Amino acid sequence: MNNISIISIMLTLIVSLIVPPAFAAVYASRHKKQGIWSAWLVGALGFFVPQILIRLPILAALSRTDGFIAFSQTHTLIYGFALAFTAGLFELSGRYAAARCLKKNLTYRRALAAGLGHGGIEAIIITGLAYLSNVVFLVMLQTGGFEATVAQTTAAGGDVTALLTAKDALMNTPWALFLLAGFERLLAMTCHAAMSMLVCYGVHTNRVLPWTLACLAMHTCMDFIASISLFVGKGLSQTMAYTIIYVLLTAVTVFAIVILKTIRARWAAEEAQEVPYDSQA
């Protein structure tokens, strides 16, 4: 494996595994005694419970059925939309539950922290742990540990197919794809912060429906864009698919930044108009 691939893997590992908690720590240190860490953890649970504990196990069970496999192969567009919509719906339930938990002391900063927790824990679990595994695999390849593991597995009568397949996948993946995984996490974390902000602002203003629907629409759109990769080999080249995906995801991320800035201004204006209790005589 060339040095560029190794650097790309390390950069994505840093972005997905180290940046989320590090950024939260810096944010919490800048805004002490404002419940940043508790909001981050609540936001993280808003992803972990509905997605990791509920939706993904359901999808894993369905993926073992012939009917589901056949449907995904013959109805790619509907399948991609269904994955995007259910991801948005399940995570919306987590975002709403998080916002309700924070409602008694729901500030813009805590809402942002919840969004960072939601996107951060997703980055850690979905990408960070996978790339940590890649790094361990690389170390094994460089030190001879991989060959020793294969030899031991073979001597014990085990199947080494999975090990060899993992090695081939790691060695033959273009370096740009490793780097794009980190870039995608940066985009996704920004979008998750904005989507959680939409829900939190809806709870804050007691106008839940329009803001949660906006969140659902945005999440479905973002994940449906990612499903374009399902069409690779079906009239769409890998290069073209990834170009379309990342151009569109970047556009959605720009929109997410606009959302964050707009809600920040509105929230600040509302807080400025509030009259402190201790000033009332």
Predicted segments with their positions:
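Hydrophobic alpha-helical segments at protein termini of multi-pass membrane proteins
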Residues: 1-281
